[in-house]
């Protein structure tokens, strides 16, 4: 199935110069959504035993929860500040113009557990790398990453921790 045909390209959103990838049509298409989850799952076969899927707010929740269900794993959300009740672990990371932060329930993961980090798009890799740092703070281990789309021109996969497999369903070369 051609998943690209189910991704709507929206120019100049959320600001001028950005070509936004809207996955709403993909989510509305039962066969397309199922194919996306199956293709994400196919990339996890070489990642070893996994205990949880960690989904990054917000579209990583949609894909991550569906993928967790498909793989028979639990789901753990990583959220923006102030969305989770305490205690939480926090990780600050750099953006192009400033900083942002992500949070994880302090007791959601335990030492020795292995997780798959999932998001819809990897652009610069900052959000995924910060999520990996949160997982490390918890004592758990990142077994792999899975993304529906990689914006290759931003080199985000190079920002991920070395030696950890990353699976991408679709690679976009241009902005």
Curated annotation (Swiss-Prot):
Pathway: Purine metabolism; AMP biosynthesis via salvage pathway; AMP from adenine: step 1/1. Its EC number is 2.4.2.7. Catalyzes a salvage reaction resulting in the formation of AMP, that is energically less costly than de novo synthesis. Keywords: Cytoplasm, Glycosyltransferase, Purine salvage, Transferase. PANTHER family: ADENINE PHOSPHORIBOSYLTRANSFERASE. The keyword Cytoplasm applies. One of its GO terms (biological process) is AMP salvage. This is Adenine phosphoribosyltransferase. The gene is apt. Homodimer. InterPro entries: Ade_phspho_trans (IPR005764), PRibTrfase_dom (IPR000836), PRTase-like (IPR029057), UPRTase/APRTase (IPR050054). GO terms for cellular component: cytoplasm. One of its GO terms (molecular function) is adenine binding. It is found in: Cytoplasm. It catalyses: AMP + diphosphate = 5-phospho-alpha-D-ribose 1-diphosphate + adenine. It holds the Pfam family Pribosyltran. Belongs to the purine/pyrimidine phosphoribosyltransferase family.
């Amino acid at each position: 199935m051609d998943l690209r045909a189910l991704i709507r390209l929206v120019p100049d959103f959320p600001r001028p110069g950005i070509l936004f990838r809207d996955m709403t049509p993909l989510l509305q298409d039962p066969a397309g959504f199922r194919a996306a989850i199956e293709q994400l799952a196919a990339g996890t076969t070489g990642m070893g035993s996994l205990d949880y899927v960690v989904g990054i707010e917000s579209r990583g929740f949609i894909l991550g929860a569906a993928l967790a269900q498909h793989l028979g794993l639990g789901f753990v959300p990583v959220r923006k500040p102030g969305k989770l009740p305490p205690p939480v672990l926090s990780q600050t990371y750099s953006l192009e113009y400033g900083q942002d932060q992500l949070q994880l329930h302090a007791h959601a993961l335990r030492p020795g557990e292995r997780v798959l980090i999932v998001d819809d798009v990897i652009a610069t890799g900052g959000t995924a790398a910060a999520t990996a740092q949160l997982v490390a703070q918890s004592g758990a281990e990142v077994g792999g990453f899975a993304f529906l789309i990689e914006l290759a021109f931003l080199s985000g996969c190079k920002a991920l921790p070395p030696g950890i497999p990353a699976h991408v369903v679709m690679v976009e070369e241009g902005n």
